[in-house]
Design a protein with these regions (language model features):
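A short acidic, often aromatic-flanked loop/helix-cap motif at beta-alpha or helix-coil junctions
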Residues: 119-124
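Flexible, acidic/histidine-containing loops and adjacent segments that form or flank the divalent-metal
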Residues: 1-11
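Cap/insert and terminal regions of metallo-dependent hydrolase folds
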Residues: 12-34, 38-118
């Protein structure tokens, strides 16, 4: 979904590929948790990269946006399929995922899914 985002370079205006996007992995007692922003590069790409760094660790928490609020349900299915095979204990979904997609995640993964928001506090 890079077609709507642009950045200024010395060569002119080009599509933004979000190569500067960040995610944070919190490591504690053989577990890892992932905090991300809107995941423009794809939450599954982020999770795969972090998961490969910590093989054998338990995936405790995913908190972030998946940026699929205007996407077809196919993108939801790709993410849901990945999560089914790499299931965290908790999934905190942020606004850019879209409330309709949040409902699908909640329906698919039940009580492990919560709606995350600015100022929310949760304990690992």
């Amino acid at each position: 979904h890079f077609e709507r985002f642009f950045t200024q370079t010395p060569e002119g205006v080009v599509p933004d590929i979000f190569n500067d996007e960040l995610a944070v992995a919190l490591i504690a007692e053989n577990t890892y948790s992932v905090l991300s922003a809107c995941s423009h590069r794809g939450i599954t790409n982020i999770l795969r990269t972090i998961g490969n760094c910590f093989p054998g660790y338990t995936f405790k928490l995913l908190a972030g946006g998946f940026h699929i609020h205007n996407a077809q349900d196919e993108k939801f299915s790709i993410i849901a399929d990945y999560l089914k095979n790499n299931l965290p204990e908790q999934i905190g979904i942020c606004h850019c995922t879209g409330i309709d997609k949040y409902a699908l995640f909640r329906q698919t993964f039940g009580n492990r899914v919560f709606y995350n928001y600015t100022g929310n506090t949760f304990y690992l």
